[in-house]
Amino acid sequence: MPRSRINGNFIDKTFSIIANILLRIIPTTSGEKEAFTYYRDGMSAQSEGNYAEALQNYYEAMRLEIDPYDRSYILYNIGLIHTSNGEHTKALEYYFRALERNPFLPQAFNNMAVICHYRGEQAIRQGDSEIAEAWFDQAAEYWKQAIALTPGNYIEAHNWLKITRRFE
């Protein structure tokens, strides 16, 4: 049974109903419709913490989806799952792949910066300040890109850049 029929959340049900109506109205191929169904089911599973199911749906959506912009969001969501699972190297890979298809994803830049900052903090705890600085510098670059795309967002990152004198 499609996930859209079993989800009990009002907002998710409403989204599913509207999405189904739009899929009938908007001229799309059956492959695009099927890709969107997998994407929608992946988002639903992800929101419930069912990451294995979400990944299966996202991989199917990737197999079917041809539009680079739409693929960027699928890849981004796969990156989110890997981030949640602590698989930071994999997460970075998927965020990079998302940005290759859509360079206007500030949330991907932000998440990459958060991972780099976390790795910098880990390096400090391990007593390696040189490696830590390299990770912090990389985090700064990603945060600058996120902020450039959406000025006024990422206030904490902006403040960190100022405090650490990494903002130009």
UniProtKB/Swiss-Prot annotation:
SUPFAM superfamilies: TPR-like
GO CC, alphabetical: chloroplast thylakoid membrane
A Gene Ontology BP annotation from the UniProt entry: photosynthesis
Topology within the bilayer: Peripheral membrane protein
Key words, A-Z: Chloroplast, Membrane, Photosynthesis, Plastid, Repeat, Thylakoid, TPR repeat
Pfam family, one: TPR_1
Record InterPro entries: PSI_Ycf3_assembly, TPR-like_helical_dom_sf, TPR_rpt, Ycf3/AcsC/BcsC/TPR_MFPF
Gene: ycf3
Keyword match Lipid metabolism: no
TPR repeats mapped onto the chain: 35-68, 72-105, 120-153
Name of the protein in question: Photosystem I assembly protein Ycf3
Principal subcellular localisation of the protein: plastid
Family: Belongs to the Ycf3 family.
Localization (cell): Plastid, Chloroplast thylakoid membrane
NCBIfam families tied to this protein: PRK02603.1
Protein role: Essential for the assembly of the photosystem I (PSI) complex. May act as a chaperone-like factor to guide the assembly of the PSI subunits.
Keyword Transcription (UniProt): no
